[in-house]
């Protein structure tokens, strides 16, 4: 049996005997052979040395490492490899040991390996923090390949405490692993990781992005068009990407972005070469994922704007009322001391009305100041739109003159609204200007 066929068989038998519910609690989602081969082929091995070191954190059954070594030896006949795998799961360790032994037997002296049965994060926390207990010369690697655990943890979890410089908001093991792997690389060395897309934007991941994109630079990204077909055997509904990072401060001119429909059709790959500044942009270091030239042009045009809403004294806020929590303050019909409560269903054709929304409660009493807001100029935006809808960004102008009998109104938290940061009121020109921007095709595509 060929090398990868053997590993696939061993992995399949393990998955059959280990319930998915147990693996999910551990954050384990196993990589297919097809994905492992694709990831192995993403590395640049043109300047490969005679002896290289490979790290696989959270190795599982070892399929990623073995796919990489299989490719390496097929192209570099004189290279030998030293493998380091981290794995703590007692259930999968026997499979990993068997697979690495099979690899060693296939290539004899060209392969040496060790399995470290320690926590990947905690065992290196002093080194990562560079404190007094850190090793003088922590081990570094030529290549890192990984499919890290996807598991939300609390901020007081030991792993989160061990890596404070990358934690802000709600931590997840996957980006702690990615940060540590970048730390583990030699200068100018590469890592290939399969991770969720969630880190590419948002405040929770800002600290991670600052570390990840300053210590390293993106060389390549692979996207899956269909999110339910990445870990198809695992039935995971998670938007996922594969990323190739180089540990360097030098920014490349461009990033190669490839895409396929799923993890089983790597024969049909679309390629796009994108300027680096169109991928990583702004003070927040958001990562944009264009898949065609039109997407690139949209990003370039948006980046031409010289100011943001906060720069102009404006802020996007979320509707105040969480209806299922504040139902005691809600009313089905207007009455004494009631105010109109606005839902996303009230945003229609660029305006905001208060026709029946289809919700049970369209009114709120005015007894709690924290649940109501001034009746003044706003732009309302739907927070969520159905996938089949033509426009992702749907908004409407809220005009206080349409509801002039009320001093205050209520907004349900499925809408966002644009307001002045200082609590004042936008003039009509600003209100309609913001609406025109948000309602444009450019912003909708963005």
At which residue positions do the language-model features occur?
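Signature of N6-adenine DNA methyltransferases within the class I
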Residues: 24-25, 29-38, 59-66, 80, ...
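S-adenosyl-L-methionine
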Residues: 1-48
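Polybasic, glycine- and aromatic-enriched phosphate-binding surface used to engage nucleic acids
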Residues: 297-446
């Amino acid at each position: 049996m060929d090398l990868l066929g053997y590993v696939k068989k061993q992995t399949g038998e393990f998955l059959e005997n280990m319930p998915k519910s147990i693996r999910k609690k551990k954050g384990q989602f196993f990589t297919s052979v097809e994905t492992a081969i694709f990831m192995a082929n993403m590395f640049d091995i043109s300047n490969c040395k005679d002896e290289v070191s490979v790290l696989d954190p959270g190795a599982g059954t070892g399929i990623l490492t073995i796919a990489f070594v299989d490719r390496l030896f097929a192209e570099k006949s004189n290279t030998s490899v030293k493998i380091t795998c981290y794995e703590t799961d007692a259930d999968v360790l026997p499979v990993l040991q068997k697979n690495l032994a099979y690899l060693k037997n296939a290539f004899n002296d060209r392969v040496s390996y060790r399995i470290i049965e320690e926590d990947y994060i905690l065992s290196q926390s002093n080194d990562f923090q560079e404190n007094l207990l850190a090793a003088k010369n922590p081990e570094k690697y030529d290549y890192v390949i990984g499919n890290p655990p996807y598991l939300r943890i609390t901020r007081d979890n030991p792993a989160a405490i061990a890596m404070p410089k990358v934690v802000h908001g709600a931590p997840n093991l996957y980006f702690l692993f990615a940060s540590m792997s970048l730390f583990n690389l030699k200068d100018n060395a590469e890592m290939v990781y399969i991770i969720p897309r969630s880190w590419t934007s948002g405040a929770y991941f800002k600290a991670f992005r600052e570390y990840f994109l300053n210590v390293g630079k993106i060389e390549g990204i692979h996207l899956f068009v269909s999110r339910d077909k990445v870990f198809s055997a695992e039935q995971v509904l998670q938007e996922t990407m594969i990323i190739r990072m180089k540990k360097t401060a030098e920014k490349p001119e461009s990033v190669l972005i490839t895409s396929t429909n799923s993890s089983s059709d790597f024969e049909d790959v679309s390629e796009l070469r994108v300027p680096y500044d169109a991928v990583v942009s702004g003070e927040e270091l958001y990562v944009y994922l264009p898949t065609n030239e039109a997407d690139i042009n949209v990003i370039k045009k948006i980046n031409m704007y010289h100011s943001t809403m906060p720069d102009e004294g404006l802020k996007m806020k979320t509707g105040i009322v969480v209806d299922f929590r504040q139902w005691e303050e809600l009313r089905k019909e207007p009455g004494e001391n009631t105010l109109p409560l606005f839902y996303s269903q009230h945003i229609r054709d660029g305006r905001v009305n208060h026709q029946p929304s289809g919700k049970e409660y369209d009114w709120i009493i005015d007894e709690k100041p924290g649940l109501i807001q001034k009746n003044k100029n706003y732009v309302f935006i739907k927070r969520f739109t159905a996938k089949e809808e033509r426009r992702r960004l749907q908004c409407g102008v809220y005009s206080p003159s349409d509801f002039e009998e009320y001093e205050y109104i209520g907004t349900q938290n499925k809408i966002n609204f644009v307001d002045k940061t200082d609590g004042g009121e936008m003039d009509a020109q600003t209100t309609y200007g913001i609406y025109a921007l948000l309602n444009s095709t450019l912003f909708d595509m963005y």
